[in-house]
Amino acid sequence: RNGTHKFPGFYSFSTVEHGKRREIDALPIRERAIHKCLCNNLLEEIYARSFIYDNGAGQAGKGMDFCLRRLKKHLRDHYRRYGLDGGIYQFDFASYFSSLPHDEIKRRARMKIMDDRLYALFCQIVDDFQNMRTADKEAERKRGVPLGSEIGQMVALDFATPIDHYIKDVRRIHGYGRYMDDGYVISHS
């Protein structure tokens, strides 16, 4: 109401997924409602415009099933054109969520969020990410977004979008897909 927002902190816990330990910084329900409102009413619309079709994470109507269907299509298309010639390259951006720099997140958001009050709220939320358990080293405190935040998910999706466009639009590689920080490239050379 008056342009101020007080962040209550994170609930931090660990989980093991596919044999990999993940540190989760989850938001309290009230804070999650603020993030959801900002995502649903602003960020999804302005960020999703720049996503490639073959990015399946965090978008309505997409997800893991969509990515699997696209991978199968890319494999069939490659086989029809090149047979067994070529290869599949998988990638996973190491420490992706914990390495995203806050200054760059805010710089990129400024180009998309025109309303000064909404941009200020967005920046305050990004600054609040410095309180995550996963950002416990002083040098790293201005890096990282939580896995448990919709805003963190949207920012993480956006951050690798220039790579997506380079591979799809500049290199013209049809067999490329990404789900958050994981992806593949199918190439004949």
Model-identified regions with their sequence ranges:
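Short, charge-rich binding segments
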Residues: 14-16, 25-30, 77-82
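Conserved polymerase palm-domain catalytic core
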Residues: 74-180, 184-188
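Reverse-transcriptase-like RNA-dependent polymerase core
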Residues: 2-20, 119-136
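Active-site-proximal segment of RNA-dependent polymerases
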Residues: 39-91, 95-98
